[in-house]
Amino acid sequence: MSRRIDSHEFYEVDKSGKEISFLFDGSVVWAREGDTISSALVASGRKIVSRSFKYHRPRGIYDADGYGPESLVTVDDEPNLLADRVLARNGMDVRSQNNWPSLDFDLAEINDVFVPFLPNGFYYKMFHKPKWLWPIAEKQIRKVAGLGSIDTAGRHNSRRYEKRYRFPDICIVGGGPSGLAAAKAALGEGKQVLLLDDHPELGGHSLHSLSQIQQSPFSELEGLSEHEGIRKLAAELQDNPNLEIMSGAMVFGVYEDNLVAAQWGNDLMKIRADKVILATGASDRHLVFDNNDRPGIMTARGVERLIMVHGIAPAEEAVVVTTHDGGYHTALLLHGAGVKLKAVVDSRASGTEGVFEKQLEDLNIPIYREMTAHRAHGRKKLQRVDVGPVKGGESFQSFDCDLLVTAVGLMPRLNLLSMGRGR
């Protein structure tokens, strides 16, 4: 069961946000200022937040970052907003999508039983004979197609959708450590800088990192932990009159002649810059195993974000599956939040004996080498994980847990770079 934490062994928990509440499918959810919808739902103990598009399998919070498949919700009659990115507001009305009659009891989940009979494009071949059958089937297929419902009643027709323009010297996409470092350097040369980031808070992955800053080009940050240093850097830059920051701006296009297109709230931003810097960072890779989509399976960065940014322990018992040293950092954060670590499962024969691994060994946390996850058990929530040899074969051991963390490396976000024909 997830819960709020008042203290953590390795950092100071921010408890300054005042308590607010909102509705989720008609039920009251308590949150703190600074929470996203997703983090508030996790803190309330909710496991299922959505249903998969076709088979209506239950979905939980996966990466808490807006890049998972689970976080589309309707907020105040506006459909398809990312619960991982939308900040909780007092009194807001949030509804889940793609389920009937309810999120926890979705009759369309029966589709999951008929997976072998519903391959991709099945509707092109089925229901066409006899001829009278297709018009009936077509109506039913159209009912289940698409996600979210448009506000056809016009209850919020006062919303305005504008087109706005900016002409900075430098446009930086990404407000993580690289983007902020680039902004600081450009501002030092007297440039007009526009910084766009798709999250409510600047800082990227450094917001949930305990690692110590070393060999920094900025001497004032040397020796600080990353989460302290990045907040200090962001606070310093925000007061610069030559910098405009657009938090929560989703950049969706980079075109010829340095034209950048973004959605910022309800506005379409068209930005023409002398230079464009892409500092879009990376996201967690996915681990393939049986039932890897069940509620209770999360990425490492998603877990770290819940703990360090929102002060939430996402489970009672956890297993961490990793392929690199970063998995030990996540495991240490879980331990510091009071989560019982059943095992750290490392696919490598040996690591680099980093500081986080050494701390876990001193805490007598079981570490299994050359192993990985084989199968997850549970339907509406994770109940057990089977682990075994990386090369396959029989599972070696099973662990009862309500959280499986996958830390299997990062993949750079190259979409905008590819679109802009970058190399």
Tell where the protein language model's regions lie, with residue ranges.
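Residues forming the flavin
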Residues: 2-423
